[in-house]
Every structure is written in structure tokens, then in C-alpha cells.
């Protein structure tokens, strides 16, 4: 199974375990697919170019048939403000919630969903640029900056620690009772990282 389909499977697993239910019965995997599309469009449109190579790659990897005019429209509706490069994808937040909040006991993915998704973004972006013979330094830098942003959020919750798996298991099995919301928020806030994302995730933990 390739990493994108693995992440779709993880979306289903997180939903099945009650971590998240999106408004309007939108599936988390569909939300992720949209976010991955926006990510690739963002890389392409930084230099204003979107050609047949990019179109073919998106069709193959995500199943969307996106014309140049559609790509421009996606950019205009979602990416004109400077904040896109620092905006954490919604699905990524829920993956962080599942892992850092220990929402799933005996997680079949060993609490590595968020880490896997960040690696998938990186790999997908690298493959996208490799498939485009006209890739520019600007596009490479944009990909690098976006991946750094994702990694900083993982670090913020300790999800890049080499021993994270054992730490998560220890947290789940230390006693039979779940930590209350205040304890969990205190634990998450004790980690260094990005305040805005912590506020979002901490709010979700109380849901």
C-alpha cells in the first residue's frame, strides 16, 4: 500500500474510533484528499505555472482532473493570503489529536498517524517536483518550508521523539483511568511548540 492510501486508511480508522466527525457527513479521507490537492496546487502556483505534467501527476495520485483555470481558481479562493504556508491542515490537526491526546487505546498504527501524514506530504511534494521537468528553486523552497511547518507541529507535541511509541504506550497503560482534560492539557502545554495549534488541539480534546 502506498503512503497516500495508508493515510486514507488511517482517516477511516480515526473516524471509526470516534476521534472526529466532520460536519455534513464529510469523510475525513475526502477532506485529506482535498487538502493534498491544495498542497500540490500551492507548490505549482508559487511561480504561476501549471502545465500538463502537473495535471497528469494530480490525476494519477489523487484522481482529480484539474485544468489550469481550475488550479488558478483554487489558488484564488484558498491561497491568496500569506498565511497558507503556516496554516496547519485540518486533517493533520485531528491526527495530532489522536496521537498526542492518546485517543485510541492499543492504536494499530502505534500512535504514528500524524508522523506518517507529515512524511506523506514530504514524499508527495518531492515526487510532484520530480515529475515536473520545469521545477524551480522557488517551488523547492516552498515545499521545504511547508514540511518544516508540519515537523514543528509534530515536535510541539513530542511526536518526533524516537521513543514516542513506548512513551505513548506507557501513558496508556500506567493505570486504568484516563487522565482528565485538565491533566491532558497541562501535559500538552508542557511541550514546546506553536501556541495557535495547541489552542486548536486543546479545544478539540475537550469535545
Question: Could you describe each region identified by the protein language model?
Answer:
Residues 1-185:
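Small-residue-enriched hydrophobic alpha-helices in membranes
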